[in-house]
């Protein structure tokens, strides 16, 4: 298939620039693959469409304030986006500067703190901080909002560009399907008899990388680190053995589960994945998916197309546009069953 097969015209005013006042105020578009029927609801109603014994799998990765601003010894401005923390003091980052940096260059930050460039690794730079990098980011870092949110980060983003169950620090973009859940929704889901389990996948900046090749099969996915625990594997197997559904909360949870089952059986693992799911893929674990509405021609639209069918996906997105759903990270959600 070609990239343009996944194009749709999205009015710019449907790209959400801010979150709604309350997480669960988001709208929810439900699509049933068997009946091919749509339903329009509020996200707070989602428990009504889940069944006792269903297993929701959520990504508990926590967004780090990964954007830093500094300057070189010459005074030139430098902007960093931390891609991956590799040690207590070391990390890989994308760096924007008027002139490319080289090994042993220093980047000076506020409060007398500094970073040293150790080496270049392809498009990234390996750097060393003058103190624990997570502490430094928490002191000086900014929330790395996606490129389609056309504003600077604000104080509200520290809370709202984060799921309420985030635990494991490491993502530079939020697993956005989880942003709609608040404590009341989680309580209603548990009261319904639905089980919840967690995977960890640290979302990298590569999630925003566009598909540049015409044949989608030629696209090379970015790599992200994930963990599927023995407890999660046991929960999935228990649900499957009872004939219950496994529903991924977000494409990151789905990609983690499918990566861990690439050999045909779900196994515990902790490693990188560059799995690319597009039409023709045979799903091994997931029976349902909760996800936001994604960019035209993106790998995430291709994943949704693989899950519900290409024509069905394009029709679903047209339905969302016609009904004025909000798109992307701070937008509305869909439940695909």
From Swiss-Prot:
It is an enzyme of class 2 (transferase). Its main location: cytoplasm. GO terms for molecular function: S-adenosylmethionine:tRNA ribosyltransferase-isomerase activity. It catalyses: 7-aminomethyl-7-carbaguanosine(34) in tRNA + S-adenosyl-L-methionine = epoxyqueuosine(34) in tRNA + adenine + L-methionine + 2 H(+). Keywords: Cytoplasm, Queuosine biosynthesis, S-adenosyl-L-methionine, Transferase. Its EC number is 2.4.99.17. It is found in: Cytoplasm. GO terms for cellular component: cytoplasm. HAMAP family: QueA. Monomer. Belongs to the QueA family. This is S-adenosylmethionine:tRNA ribosyltransferase-isomerase. It comes from Legionella pneumophila (strain Corby). The gene is queA.
